[in-house]
Design a protein with these regions (language model features):
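Bacterial Sec-dependent N-terminal signal peptides
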Residues: 1-27
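Cleft-lining beta-strand/loop regions that shape enzyme active-site pockets
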Residues: 19-30, 34, 38-51, 74, ...
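Polar, glycine-rich mid-to-C-terminal structural blocks
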Residues: 287, 299, 306, 310-377
């Protein structure tokens, strides 16, 4: 507290060269040393100094010497970081993609301001308040700046719609737009529900309860909880979700720093009975690992997939006077069995820490469980069935599913990187939306009988050749195109219905999801 006050007071001091520095030099404290150095550089350095940048770099340097996750964010970065976790932002409410320098509406947010104003899927937004935004090479950031704004303010949108020659005008009143952290909820099989959580934000628990209730009404007895690629978020949200699975007073997680805190289940969870499988991969981190660790250590369910990221540090967000922020590690968290799952790091060597995923791939850990080794000192036991588990570097799943390296070929990655596949899908849906909705009035019919036309695939290949993107051989081409047909079918389903339908198609070929279904089916 004293240090933050000193920093704030220093910002208010007059910059009197000489006397002030001489006075401060007589005070021998680490904080005063830092202040003196900044004052000397700012007032005496031969060239003009950007003081704001100087201070920010000093803060980054201090935090970088602590651990890999203590960090500094400017006020602009703070807004971008917090938006997915806060649960809402203020704007017009559309899901969109950019195609050929034009904003194409994929879906208006249900009950959002754009839907209420009459904007439809497939519309192209070509102007905002009379200013053209299509065909003028305006940056995505600038377009978003024009579309977003405080709740209650109005914006006039120029729309190009198929079947109309003239530009249509819509007046939209901006409002709070929910940012969903649950990206899919549907029934995988009769009696088996599926929920995918993208991150743990302010509204995650509320969304999760609604998803549970929806699936339970559809007859769910078993649940597959997908935390793949979930990078974490708010610890409280993770604790609240874990509470839904556990019995009263079951330990969920505890933190240990300058103080120790325990978080236990309240006994009011909505899915305390029933088969539970948690899906994880190498990008499952932080808050997502709290849920995973609680389920595994309490023997509440099985963990399926690959070893998780290994982030066992708790950060506190501290807002600075200019609304920039530091995230400071204040504790380690531990799973119920006492495991700290933070992977090893050396202070000040963030580059080595960042190479962990490449090192796992190089060692074969993503393809073979036998390539993963834990020291005996990191051995722990689950609390009910006393199964062996390990700490010190992520959570090892109960059932390992290797990374399918045959899906993502070099050819496919190159096409994806240049947005060839995405743009082909957008053009196809845009040109055929009416015909598709008439031919496939229900998703079940679409899933059962729709196939991507060969002409779409041929166009992707031709577009790739124009960009000098070619397969190495016939085998790579066949493998890529087979997977691309599935991917495109899922993308069309997303554009016509939503993300539930997208995952309902993609998961039919997911090795991890299919492994989970097999475990539930075979008890």
């Amino acid at each position: 507290m004293k240090k933050s006050v000193l920093i704030y007071l220093f910002a208010l001091l007059p910059f009197t060269v000489g006397a002030q520095i001489k006075l401060n030099l007589n005070r021998n404290t680490p904080m005063q040393k830092l202040i003196n150095a900044e004052m000397a550089i700012n007032q005496l350095y031969v060239d003009t100094v950007d003081e704001k940048r100087l201070v920010e770099e000093a803060i980054r340097g201090m935090l970088g010497s602590l651990d890999p996750h203590s960090s500094y964010a400017t006020k602009e970065e703070v807004k971008a970081l917090q938006e997915p976790l806060n649960g809402n932002f203020e704007g017009i409410g559309v899901e969109y993609n950019m195609i050929e320098d034009t904003l194409l509406v994929i879906q208006p947010v249900v009950d959002g301001p754009s839907e209420k104003a009459g904007i439809m899927a497939g519309d192209r937004i070509v102007s905002v308040d009379g200013t053209p935004i299509a065909g003028v090479h305006m940056s995505k950031e600038e377009i978003m700046r024009r579309l977003r704004g405080p709740k209650g303010t109005k914006v006039r949108l120029g729309i190009r719609r198929q079947g109309f020659d003239e530009e249509l005008q819509f007046r939209v009143t901006r409002d709070k737009i929910p940012v969903k952290s649950i990206t899919a909820t549907y029934m995988l099989r009769p009696g088996v529900g599926y929920i995918r959580i993208g991150n743990f934000g302010a509204t995650t628990h509320e969304e999760f309860v609604k998803s549970l209730q929806k699936l339970q009404k559809l007859g769910m007895k078993s649940l597959v909880l997908d935390l793949q690629e979930n990078g974490g978020g708010y610890m409280k949200a993770a604790v609240d979700v874990a509470n839904e699975f556990l019995q009263r007073l079951d330990l969920i997680v505890y933190t240990d720093g300058r103080e120790r805190s325990e978080f236990r289940a309240k006994g009011n969870g909505r899915f305390r009975v029933g088969s539970l499988i948690v899906l994880v991969d190498e990008y499952t981190a932080s808050a997502a690992e709290i849920v995973t660790g609680a389920v595994q250590d309490q023997d509440r369910g099985l963990v399926v997939g690959r070893r998780t990221f290994g982030k066992g540090l708790v950060q506190r967000q501290i807002t600075l006077p200019d609304t920039s922020m530091i995230r400071l590690t204040i504790a380690h968290y531990y799973t119920p069995a006492g495991r700290c799952i933070q992977k090893p790091y050396v202070k000040g060597k963030s580059e080595d820490y960042a190479m962990d995923m490449q090192n796992r791939l190089r060692r074969g850990e993503l393809m073979n469980a036998d390539s993963i080794h834990f020291a005996d000192s990191l051995r722990y036991y689950t609390l009910r069935q006393h199964r062996t588990v390990y700490g010190g570097g992520g959570i090892m799943p109960d059932y390992f599913v290797p990374l399918d390296t045959t899906i993502y070929t070099r050819y496919h990655r190159a096409l994806q990187a240049r947005s060839v596949v995405l743009n082909a899908n957008l053009r196809y849906v845009d040109d055929n939306r009416r015909e598709l909705t008439e031919a496939y009035p229900t998703f079940d019919l679409f899933k059962q009988s729709f196939e991507i036309p060969k002409s779409v695939i041929d166009n992707i290949v031709e577009e790739g050749e124009k960009l000098d993107i070619k397969p190495q051989d016939k085998a790579e081409k066949k493998k890529t195109l087979d997977y691309m047909k599935l991917q495109l079918k899922a993308l069309v389903a997303r554009d016509l219905w939503g993300m539930d339908e997208y995952f309902a198609i993609m998961n039919e070929s997911s090795p991890i999801v299919q492994a989970a279904i097999g475990l539930i089916t075979n008890n």
